[in-house]
Curated annotation (Swiss-Prot):
SUPFAM superfamilies tied to this protein: Nucleic acid-binding proteins (SSF50249)
Function: With S4 and S5 plays an important role in translational accuracy. Located at the interface of the 30S and 50S subunits.
PROSITE patterns: RIBOSOMAL_S12
Record keywords: Chloroplast, Plastid, Ribonucleoprotein, Ribosomal protein, RNA-binding, rRNA-binding
Subunit-structure text: Part of the 30S ribosomal subunit.
Protein's name according to its UniProt entry: Small ribosomal subunit protein uS12c
Signal peptide: none
GO cellular component annotations of the record: chloroplast; small ribosomal subunit
One BP term from GO: translation
Family membership: Belongs to the universal ribosomal protein uS12 family.
Main location: plastid
MF GO annotations: rRNA binding; structural constituent of ribosome
Location within or outside the cell: Plastid, Chloroplast
Amino acid sequence: MPTIQQLIRSARKKVSKKTKAPALKSCAQRRGICLRVYTVTPKKPNSALRKVARVRLTSGFEVTAYIPGIGHNLQEHAVVLVRGGRVKDLPGVRYHIVRGTLDTAGVKNRVQSRSKYGVKLAATKAAAKK
């Protein structure tokens, strides 16, 4: 326990909270350009080929972002919107690409959780009629 004199000499330091998505610079999303689209394998108990992209953001950062959903149309030089959110079994992947915006198409034939994968209601109705 410090004395009053010690507290006068130097006040208590505020503990600063470390951000989980520093590349977004306190923004909800950031635009970026795909530099490389590839697959990576997850950590130990899981097995898959997860689709990821290396993205250069408008904030100047270069990050690895996960491409959610089944199938995608992303290639090099595609303009994408990146949000925060890590992938637990991929070390170093702390961002997600937003589906259905800019150059990223929504997931085909998606009926449930459509808003998370950029699918409009009209698209699902058209697929149901066929």
